[in-house]
Amino acid sequence: MLRSNTARLALAAVLGWQLFAIIPAQASSHMDAPLISLDDPANTTDVYAFKSKSGGIDYLTTALGVYPFEEPGVGPNNYRFDDTVIYDINVALGNSTTSGRTDITYRFEFQTRFANENTVLQSYLGVVGGRRLFAPKQNLRQFYKVTKIDRRTGNVTVLGDQLKVPPNNQGRVTPFYNQGNDGDNPAQEGARTVAGLDAYTKLAIFPLNRNYQVFAGQRDDGFFADIQSIFDLDFSFSKPQPFDSQGGFNIHMVVLNIPLTELAGSSAVGVYATTSRRDASGAVKQVARQGNPLFVEALIPLKDKDRYNISRPTADEAFRDYAANPELSAVLGVQPISPGLLETIFIPDLIKVDLTTPPARLSGEAGFNRLSVFGGDVLPSTATGGNVAGGWPNGRRFGDDVIDIAVIALGAAGNGPDFSNTNVDKVTENDITYNQVFPYAATPLNGRVHQHHN
């Protein structure tokens, strides 16, 4: 039995497409499973998916992060996308959100070149100018191709090729990422307009055929939480200052704006991502998978974590019991706020997005709340005729506090009815503000000026 009106609204918001027939006739610790933890360029960190609007066009914004815990100041700074890894963002349309079937795949493939190999210098030969990508002093240069694969028809369409990745933010040699265009200053905070973006990011946003937009490059790690206290089973969160486990680290990220006109009129979609490598025979082998935050880390036991990473959402019935009877419920002595709630979120493991709402509120905008529905952040849904969650688990936005949202859903934040002040791990925001325009993810942190865990 639901405990309050708030819980009823939460359940309706989370389960909307099932309770109200929406479909027509992971934060992560970044070390999700044993094997993939040994393969940084293919190790997925987080997936984001939410409805947005830009230039009068309605989009499904999707993003995939890889390469966890990039230390901004390490030298030589050689973090990059791997030429031998295939990065896929997968979309399930309509009824496929229930079965987990992939209908469309957006594939990202990279190629690395060096302008000068007769030098000990790797990424940079000096200060990288901010007027064009691959300026003379940018030695490490990555190109990429974006391909749309329609699994329903078999059609393959190249949306863009020879697209360019901006340099990493090393500091003095990449001054235009940083406040005042000074490499000795911290990274630029989030922009509210395209004009306000740093020079390198602006140059790396590419329009593609059919109104797609894409960005690929280094970003700040936008996941925030005291992961150590959770997975050490300490749960004290008693430090006088919040401990953001991902604070001060960067990642690499691909961000794709998908026009809703490309999604076959679906009122709901499900999004997940995979990374794959080719074996000796040339066959593509999946090595990692990411959907909702926390599923692998907090619900799937050790014996099945690697199995999850090489499987598809269509096989997620095998993991249903882990969502129905989570081990953490026994550890904490609690029950989810509603029977079946976690199963609806995680089985199949897709980030489900209601596309009949207005665009999602972005972090920093009026009405945005890090707790999504539990903080009163809801959106009207044409499909349900009511309200649905403004953020995760209806999509996932940059700034959604997925730890606190999950703790509430698990029943570990008390009986309510008001969850709006929930602050389990005392980490309530990212270490740098997000952009309110594409690519939304925050500026990568300066290699010379950054702090960890604050």
Give a label for each model feature.
Residues 1-10:
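Bacterial N-terminal signal peptides that target proteins for export
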Residues 5, 17-19, 41, 434:
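Residues at the start of alpha-helices and the adjacent loop-to-helix junctions
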Residues 16-26:
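C-terminal segment of classical bacterial N-terminal signal peptides
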Residues 26-454:
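Surface-exposed extracytoplasmic segments
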